[in-house]
Amino acid sequence: MFRQGLDILDLDPILYDIIGMNRNSIGHWLPFLCEAIKHQQFFSIPKTKIIKVPITLLQLTRCAYSELTPTTLDIVDRFCQKAFSLDVSKEYFIKTGTYSSKYDFRNCYVHGAEEVKELGEYLLFIHFQALQMASPLSKPMIVGASTTNEWVVREFIPDKENAPTIYKGMPLHTEYRVFVDMDTKQVIGIHPYWDPVVMKHRFGHEADADSPHQTHDYIIFRMYEDTLMARYKENADKVKKHIEEMLPYFLLEGQWSIDVMQNGDDFYIIDMALATNSALVECVPKNLLKPAKENWIPGKPMNNKEKVAFMNEILKEIEDDEKRRKENGKNIQRTI
């Protein structure tokens, strides 16, 4: 009931702050990822801009989208044009802090001058769409899809592989879901993001399997499955190795999933979430999996500058500890 309420109740300042506590939201983990990724050359991150949505605007996501007036939508569009410094000649990938609606790719891939001018409407709709999953009328009811007060605009990464598309336009790239323990600095699991068993069941054996879209996606996936899996097997160990090399600089706590997209010879880290909230977590041995601690009590949050300063302070402590250990080792050798 509590988690459902976060998604469907009208907002007040306290609820707004509680929603901002969600560790799965990109504004929590991206600053830590940006610091860790500086220490390697293998992975990239798409250029990303995140905003905290003003409470009065965010309340619109809890109103019926179909009843919003053209004037309201125009105000949202103009706000996003300014807030994100949009360029109508560019292509964008958009999401809330936790949800992109990528399974209908037309909702999150914004391109062309007219669509970019209406980008605010796209964000408003996908946020509304995700919150509706927590409605008591939704079957099944899913909470947490968009428990966030953030909106995100990212650069769109053009396809280098001429890959076929599923989900109404999404290029079918090889993707890797890597599970890590930030406390022990270990990779505890890795799995193909597009699991063949899951995907073929989704497209070919659910209630809407006879729809043209699902039939198309089933055929495309079967046709491209061998290519996806061959590329996954060829690169999984490499991806795992480079993730492991980053972990000492990753100053998050707990267990997380890290999603890596391959585009040609380029590898992008595109998403993260708490491991216990992630699909495919069954690839992690049960004896290694730990429950995630939840804290929904708001406090004074650190801004990004404070987070970076805090992380740099910890990194300096780690470096100082390593120097001391080396010096102690030399002293022991001299004594012996």
Predicted regions and their residues:
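Conserved protein-kinase catalytic-loop segment immediately C-terminal to the catalytic Asp
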Residues: 179, 261-262
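Active-site nucleotide/adenylate-binding loops and adjacent lid/helix of ATP-dependent enzymes
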Residues: 1-174, 179-197, 203-241
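C-terminal active-site "lid" helix and adjoining low-complexity regulatory extension at the edge
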Residues: 230-241, 249-254, 262-336
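A short local loop/turn or secondary-structure capping micro-motif enriched for an aromatic residue
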Residues: 195-200, 276-280
